[in-house]
């Protein structure tokens, strides 16, 4: 068992790390004291009379040092600066008696001198009442709700993510959450095979490099590099440079390298293999996702999940591999007039993609959540379909969102990038593109005013002080829909479509509790394939459409995002975590957003989007009830839920009538929720003219010759299903066109 545990520890970056130095949150002692009391209110200790089996959890509290400092550190590092400022002010005011009176009202009054108590002196029941009241505030009192959300989320998120040096957390053990050997035990590969690094021959990890070693490492990989001490840069020459290694970048790099071009891939994240993945929720999120998986829209309404490691989103996606729907292709080819979407070329590209990433159509064994979805649909007479996956039919990994520890999921790091390095491509990790290098275009055969001649980049998190200038004949941006537009805008491009038309596939979640005793469903919510089933809801009467599927949601995320009404209620939710099946409703959005700068995303849903989500939520709840849930609910801030035992049809419909797609944390209403997006598209779309898109039909910038885009930002609108196959197929077509355009030109 100890051998298994050692093998499951994973890469040091994917494990909980002991803090080796002081804190940088900047909170004063009085602010920390106020925050500590708020943390303890969210997760208070209880009496030791609780049943012994979960005693270690029920008596657990969030007051032990250095808990509050860690929470403060996470808030400052990941929270939006405006929200953090609000929190600091409120924490300071709460440290005074009359400040507490101002913010908390009569609940802080006492019969004894000095008659007004500080927040830290209030009994638990009054503190809970104050926090519940803050959660309901809006308008000019919105800062209270923001404080509530920030403190609640990070308190619970950290509590259920911290582990000791043995990767243990008593709270996780108490709720029955155990991942030791979950996927690897079923994997027949030897330890030597697990440790194999498929990209080894072509990868340079700059976190292991310095200014002394980097030139030699590049030269050994066949890359032309010169050290320019005058400009304090490394000048690199290649045929093609690709920024990003996800769905688009991986495919583009492979096609360009196979054509004999010297390709350099820049990836700001790190490289991990199956042996490296720990399966630990928060350490994995912090390393594998953009902004640690904690990126939100400016108003806090959406949480945005986007991959940020070698393989990009394909390293952390949930395996769904769905071809572009025919009606979407028709819309794009006829409505948007992008003809290749309606061509045989695109169909052939989808064929090539599905073959290369090993898409299978069947699932041998469904996990707990998918069993619930299938049974509920069956009992309601609803059609449920199997979801194609880029993994074997017997793949039973419920933690692929933290990297596939079985090594069975065929992301670009296992497929297209392997093809690329086998054909001489080099991947530089820990390198962030800062801007494209644009010069005046003197070509008489091209109307574009600028010409892209490469990328200006820098090392992140390593010991390399000099910048990089990569000179290339072709530059491909595959940084994703959240990062390609800011990169293009920071380079001086001005097309009005850059950064606009962002689509998110908005998601809202429901849950249903299924006690293990006498249940027809086996397993835990985190076991088995994440998405193996789907129900396409299409209400002909209302015209509402949504898809229902199951998510991965780890205990820390579940605790942080679940509605909070009291400490005991939260602990009860967590005890039920393993047998709480989640269903989400996803819609093909008509609304859109903007991303002009990194981490600055705005988005607006339309009335129709909200109607679709509302219908999807109600359908998901019906499915859970039909499957036999004893209790169901939503993520609405007040803890909206319903007991299902002996429920009448009338009572259920009355409950469902109250279910709605309420606004986000910044909404004016009393109730709010958190929306999610794991698919970002359209923020640098193609168009037949510069007025209709930022790129032409070949994926080339209307403003800069030689600058192409191969990622989800290029898509004309939302796909309506997981966009991985669509992005890879589009990148396949575009990169093939790039090769054709260069075939008669001399390589570098």
UniProtKB/Swiss-Prot annotation:
Tell me the active site: 679
Report which gene this protein is encoded by: FAO4B
Entry EC no(s):
1.1.3.20
- Chief subcellular site? membrane
PANTHER family linked to this entry: LONG-CHAIN-ALCOHOL OXIDASE
Q: What does the record give as the function of this protein?
A: Long-chain fatty alcohol oxidase involved in the omega-oxidation pathway of lipid degradation.
Q: Which organism is the protein's source?
A: Arabidopsis thaliana
TM ranges: 89-109, 140-160
InterPro entries in the record: FAD-dep_OxRdtase_2_FAD-bd, FAD/NAD-bd_sf, GMC_OxRdtase_N, GMC_OxRtase_C, Long_Oxdase
Q: Would you tell me the protein name for this molecule?
A: Long-chain-alcohol oxidase FAO4B
Q: Keywords of this protein's UniProt record, alphabetized?
A: FAD, Flavoprotein, Membrane, Oxidoreductase, Transmembrane, Transmembrane helix
Q: Does the keyword Membrane apply?
A: yes
Q: Where in the cell is it found?
A: Membrane
Question: According to its record, how does it sit in the membrane?
Answer: Multi-pass membrane protein
Which domain of life, per UniProt?
A: Eukaryota
From the Swiss-Prot or TrEMBL record, what is one GO molecular function term?
long-chain-alcohol oxidase activity
Give Gene Ontology CC terms.
endoplasmic reticulum; membrane
Q: Which cysteines are joined by disulfide bonds?
A: none
Q: What reactions does this protein catalyze? A: a long-chain primary fatty alcohol + O2 = a long-chain fatty aldehyde + H2O2
Say which enzyme class the record assigns: oxidoreductase
What segments bear the compositional bias annotation Basic residues?
A: 1-18
Region (Disordered), start-end ranges: 1-25
**What is the similarity comment for this entry?**
Belongs to the GMC oxidoreductase family.
Which residues of the sequence carry a binding annotation for FAD? 238-253
């Amino acid at each position: 068992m100890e051998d298994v545990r050692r093998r499951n520890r994973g890469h040091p970056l994917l494990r909980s790390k002991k803090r080796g130095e002081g804190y940088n949150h900047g909170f004063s002692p009085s602010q920390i004291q106020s925050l500590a009391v708020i943390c303890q209110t969210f997760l208070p200790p209880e009496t030791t009379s609780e049943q012994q089996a979960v005693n270690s959890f029920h008596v657990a509290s969030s007051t032990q040092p250095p808990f509050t400092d860690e929470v403060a550190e996470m808030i400052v590092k990941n929270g939006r600066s405006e929200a953090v400022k609000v929190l600091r002010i409120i924490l300071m005011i709460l440290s005074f008696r009359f400040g507490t009176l101002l913010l908390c009202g009569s609940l802080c009054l006492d019969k004894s001198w000095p008659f007004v108590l500080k927040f830290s002196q209030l009994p638990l029941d009054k503190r809970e009442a104050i926090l519940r009241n803050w959660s309901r505030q809006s308008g000019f009192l919105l800062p209270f709700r923001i404080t509530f959300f920030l403190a609640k989320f990070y308190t619970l998120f950290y509590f259920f993510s911290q582990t000791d040096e043995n990767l243990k957390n008593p709270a996780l053990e108490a709720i029955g959450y155990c991942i030791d050997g979950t996927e690897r035990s079923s994997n027949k590969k030897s330890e030597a095979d697990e440790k194999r690094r498929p990209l080894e021959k072509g990868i340079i990890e700059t976190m292991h490099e310095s200014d002394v070693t980097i030139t030699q490492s590049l030269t050994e990989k066949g890359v032309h590099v010169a050290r320019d001490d005058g400009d304090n840069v490394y000048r690199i020459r290649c045929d093609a440079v690709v920024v990003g290694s996800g769905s688009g970048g991986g495919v583009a790099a492979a096609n360009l390298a196979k054509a004999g071009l010297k390709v350099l891939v820049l990836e700001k994240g790190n490289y991990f293999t199956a042996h490296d993945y720990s399966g630990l929720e928060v350490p994995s999120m912090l390393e594998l996702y953009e902004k640690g998986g904690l990126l939100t829209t400016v108003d806090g309404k959406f949480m945005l999940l986007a991959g940020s490691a070698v393989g990009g989103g394909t390293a952390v996606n949930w395996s769904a591999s769905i071809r572009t729907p025919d009606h979407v292709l028709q819309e794009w080819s006829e409505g948007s007039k992008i003809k290749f979407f309606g061509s045989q070329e695109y169909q052939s590209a989808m064929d090539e993609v599905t073959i290369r990433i090993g898409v299978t159509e069947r699932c041998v064994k469904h996990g707990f959540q998918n069993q619930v979805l299938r049974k509920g649909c069956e009992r309601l007479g609803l059609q449920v379909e199997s979801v194609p996956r880029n993994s074997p039919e017997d793949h039973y990994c419920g933690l692929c969102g933290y990297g596939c520890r079985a090594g069975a999921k065929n992301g670009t790091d296992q497929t297209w990038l392997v093809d690329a390095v086998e054909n001489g491509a080099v991947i530089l990790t820990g390198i962030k593109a800062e801007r494209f290098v644009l010069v005046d275009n003197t070509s008489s055969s091209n109307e574009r005013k600028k010409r892209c001649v490469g990328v200006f980049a820098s090392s992140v998190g390593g010991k390399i002080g000099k910048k990089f200038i990569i000179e290339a004949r072709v530059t491909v941006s595959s940084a994703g829909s959240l990062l390609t537009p800011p990169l293009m805008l920071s380079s001086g491009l001005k097309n009005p479509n850059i950064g606009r038309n962002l689509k998110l596939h908005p998601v809202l979640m429901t849950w249903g509790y299924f006690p293990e005793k006498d249940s027809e469903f086996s397993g835990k919510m985190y076991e088995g394939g994440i998405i193996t089933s789907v129900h396409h809801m299409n209400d002909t009467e209302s015209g509402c459409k949504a898809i229902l599927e199951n998510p991965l949601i780890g205990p820390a995320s579940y605790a942080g995002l679940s509605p909070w009404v009291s400490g005991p209620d939260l602990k009860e939710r967590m005890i039920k975590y393993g047998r709480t099946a989640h269903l989400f409703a996803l819609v093909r959005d008509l609304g859109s957003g903007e991303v002009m700068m990194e981490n600055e995303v705005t988005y607006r849903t339309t009335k129709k989007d909200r109607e679709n989500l509302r219908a999807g939520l109600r359908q998901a709840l019906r499915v859970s009830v039909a499957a036999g849930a004893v209790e169901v609910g939503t993520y609405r801030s007040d803890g909206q839920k319903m007991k299902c035992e002996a429920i009448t049809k009338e009572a259920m419909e009355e409950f469902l009538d109250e279910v709605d797609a309420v606004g986000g944390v910044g909404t004016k209403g009393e109730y709010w929720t958190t929306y999610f997006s794991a698919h970002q598209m359209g923020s640098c779309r193609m168009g037949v003219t510069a007025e209709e898109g930022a790129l032409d039909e070949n994926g080339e910038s209307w403003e800069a010759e030689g600058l192409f885009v191969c990622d989800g930002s290029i898509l004309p609108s939302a796909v309506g299903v997981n966009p991985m196959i669509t992005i890879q197929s589009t990148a396949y077509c575009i990169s093939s066109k790039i090769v054709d355009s260069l075939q008669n030109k001399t390589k570098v």
